[in-house]
């Protein structure tokens, strides 16, 4: 199975377990691995046979920024569901990093990774 990788997409969203944490937008970083058959795209050199990266980015941005979330797990699930609505994509891995989650503890980020198909 082939894959397309979108790595390091940054969005500002209201996310956090407490109401206070959700009061101010926070930076999150999203990686997505999209598994699909790319043989027709590679043999024809035709964009119509692949996935438009900008559309996937816009989808992730809309999901992340238009709703409030308590958990990055929920956000990851919603992004995966949105991506899988494209019938060409057979499997997706979504990683979400929350850099400020443990910043006071000198931790680079907290993260979640889910795989859906």
Regions found by a protein language model. Name each.
Residues 1-117:
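N-terminal, polar/charged subdomain of small-to-medium soluble alpha/beta proteins
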